[in-house]
Amino acid sequence: MVVGRVADVAVKGWAALALMALAAAACSSSHSPAVTAKPRNVFVIVMENHSASEALSAPFTASLAQRYGVAQNYHAVAHPSVPNYLALTSGSTWGLQDDSYHVLPASDLGTQLTNAHVTWRAYMEGLTSRGCLDSPVPYDPGHDPFAYYGGQCPANVVPLSELGPDLNGAATPRFVWITPDMCHDTHNCDVAVGDSWLRQEVGQITASPAWKSGGVLFITWDEDDSSSDNHVLTLVVAQGTGHRSSSKPYTHYSLLATVEDLLGVGRLGQASGATPMSDLLPS
């Protein structure tokens, strides 16, 4: 959870210099050639703070693992939460080791997709008219990484209530990011609560034309229960794959690389050297 919300909006001194250096590295990586993408929709749901074994104790989550793709050897890249969200969306933790809000350079997946004219939206449960930084709990700005880049809330970040109409309409965004609130992501509530939420949201996605026409849904957990191993569950839900299991070593950078390849854009930061999760994707 973000500490102090907007108390440390500015990144100062040596930290700012370090971030600028990291931004330069991330930007240079973004020019790497991308795999030719199929015109499919990509969905990402990020849950919270449970190990793979804990997540699989929930019946609906376990049923997805039995039916679709499972990354058995997938690890988050840091503790606490925020650096993992940044890794998933920019290919870097930016050297951060806390859950506070920081203004980072606009070198992220959202900016990348906007510049490439690829449609995208990030659906945040609990987001209100008070915006990305000031919406009340159970919304958490620390679980909304797109608000960090450039220090502002992009127009693409919207309340989760807009997902249903977008899925049922003719123009579902090519990239869909979904953040549950702090109860439904199991940060503050039992795994069973998050499992029920997933049943509803995954059902809505897999019933949509966007998913049925070749869409791919990734479900991951930002970090485990603070162990050094940081082993988390990541599922790949797509038609035509059946149950698949991969023992390859994957991380959040692998997931970002896979998403960028599917959307036809270059890889950012450490995603540039990551192994994509192609063995769990439909051919």
Predicted regions and their residues:
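N-terminal secretory targeting signals
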Residues: S28-S32
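Flexible, surface-exposed loop/gating regions in the mature catalytic domains
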Residues: P33-S283
